Amino acid sequence: MVSQNYLVFVSAARQLCGVEAFSRLLARHFGARAETHVLDADMPGLVRALEGRDAVVFNFPIVGWKRQLFTPGLAAVLARLMGRDVVVFLHEWLALDWKRRIVLAPVVLCATRLAFSAPEIADEFARTRFARLVTRRRQVVPIPPNVLPVGAEKASDISRALSVQRQGGRLLLGQFGSIYPKKQSAIVLQVAAELVRQGHDVGVVFAGSFIKGLDNVEENFFASVRDLGLADRVTVTGYVAGDDELAAIFKEIDVFCYLFPEGLTSRRGSVLAAALSGHAVVVNAPLEANALGHHGLFQRLIETHAIRLVPTEADIPTVAAAVLAARQEPPEPLDAEAEIAKLWHSICEGIDA
């Protein structure tokens, strides 16, 4: 195993998407062997930054690079011309807009190593014709949570308002992460509506913000809220910058709930972050039995009942029943710090391999 020195590309964005959060955490866990570099059009600056570095690392898609059309490809070509390895992490592929895949194609062609966020992404990439043209050095890398448990909590107006609801006996159903159609956030509203129909006092907390640039996402979401009669029961926090503020919000949530079109996959860092908060997460099972086989932390969280799987195609009443059961049975204790450290060790070791 060769230990390389890395230059990890990031954006200048202040609000980080999950993929960029992973990029920055990756550089941090490599310690002195990695530096971050804001990807921009300053190629002379990149030449200087590459001094003493053996490889560059790209992660896609990063929201902060949406307007970068040629810069990623130029940076990858420059790195190869300077004799550096090019490591490319693909957290999505076919789910990306075809125009975005065209922009990324030159970078992937330059890659000396490809890493995928989940077996499903690796498989869908391998089935494309484009895959025949690129490196065969490919691996699946377990993606860690993008938000880590913190000991300190910082109360905010939002967390205080949630605390008042909870003290009044309301069950708070939660979801963490960006709100967008493929996450099926609106289905969680249906679960809440079913619980209300059964006579339970339920609120829903979305700890995150709507992804900008997607047409009518916010409007359609709030239309669903109104149609289901949940207008006075839904809280959308917007982007929460501080982990301590987020921890205070998480503290007030009774049960997290996710229902994905493809079931749970190992790239769902938001599910990991929610499960590590100490509250149970109800989520539909993966389509493939081995989807989480490479990810030790997901397996541990399922073993301790922090993650409670319902059938992949579970109907709303089944999920609602699972939420009520999870509220009554807290997860078993887990040494989150040790498990996360073990996961990062395996990630860094895998990239060096």
Model-derived regions: residue spans:
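Donor nucleotide-sugar binding/catalytic pocket of nucleotide-sugar-dependent glycosyltransferases
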Residues: T112-R160
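Conserved donor-binding/catalytic core segment of Leloir-type glycosyltransferases
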Residues: L162-K183, L189-A192, V205
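Nucleotide-activated donor-binding/catalytic signature segment of Leloir-type glycosyltransferases, i.e.
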Residues: E218-V240, I307-L309
